Amino acid sequence: MVRIPRHLIIAASSWLSKIIIAGVQLVSVKFLLEILGEESYAVFTLLTGLLVWFSIADIGIGSSLQNYISELKADRKSYDAYIKAAIHILFASLIILSSTLFFLSDKLSSLYLTSFSDELKNNSGSYFFIASILFIFIGVGSVVYKILFAELLGWKANIINALSYLLGFLDVVAIHYLMPDSSITFALVALYAPVAILPIIYISFRYIYVLKTKVNFNTYKLLLSRSSGFLIFSSLSIIVLQTDYIVMSQKLSAADIIKYTVTMKIFGLMFFIYTAVLQALWPVCAELRVKMQWGKLHRIIFLNIIGGVFFVGLGTLFIYVLKDYIYSIIANGIDYNISGAVFVLLAVYFSIRVWCDTFAMLLQSMNQLKILWLIVPCQALIGGVTQWYFAEHYGIVGILYGLILSFSLTVFWGLPVYYMYKSKRLA
């Protein structure tokens, strides 16, 4: 009887979860556009871009903890003290970040939301603060998923994540029918409050379980010393991947912002499936590295990259053939006239992401982050300059040019070269 690898079982549940989450986000577009209108929805879209920025609210503790759990599991040792220490650190992070944003929201929103009417700009500070608080809670709560994946219980993480987004979608549907003229604030709270609250509830129960565990200062020190590397890498990666939102906020019209973000959500649904595989594969790679099973590790990675690129190509063809039908379902009445060149560029971009994200995951599972600290700032600089320049001349296509160039000139070749170098030295 063929035994299915556990990481693929977890990945399968991740696929279902990611499909539900991405589907909820896509279907929500129709309701949110009707509630908010085009310009307010464009503001809402830019604010939701902050979700990725505040994913670093866990200050790298989530990834640090995940690797410690995987390593201690491989050695059959308890890791309860690490979980308790991580929760203490995360609580402090939540308080500090929330307090800081209380004072900075007005200034930051005035820089970020500049291309809209005076009425929207006058309320932008409160919108920015509410979004920030919600996303800080989500960022801190995401440590739950790291813990569960490290314990090879990723299916539980997927259930929590999918359920939270489903509840958020039901909230959006409710305000669509009961409060059709709701503000951006109501829309943000409706969609994202459940996503913020459910993981925090789980963390609370998990903390009760480890409450009597003793934690010494060295545990905090170990978590923080390793987390700093993940924090730096995550921050740099976010700058790379979210520069398009900054450029959009300054260079694109409200209509083009909606067109770009909805298209990326559609492709994101496809790419979520591959990221689910990587998420499930991380602890597996960490354990194989500890056990020095390099041949098995290399085979898994090779097969995943080949499968990922093939899947991106097939998915792009499917989206292109059915694009008129897909866009009409998401938001009927909005002009989504997008050239074939955009779809080709998106296929190239996400294929590059398959390659780069896989090697980035490998290096993180090995705690080898120095190359990322060196190369990702170069990528961020190239991406920011090229996207700003090309968006000025080519709009949406220009943003994609910049994204592709930033990856191709840096991490596309740098990460695999460094991985092979390190794996040979450790073997």
Which residue stretches match the model-derived regions?
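Hydrophobic alpha-helical transmembrane segments
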Residues: 158-208, 378-382, 396-420
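Interfacial segments at transmembrane-helix termini and the short loops linking adjacent helices
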Residues: 105-130, 254, 320-347, 351, ...
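Helix-loop junctions and terminal segments of transmembrane helices
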Residues: 59-74, 150, 267, 271-292, ...
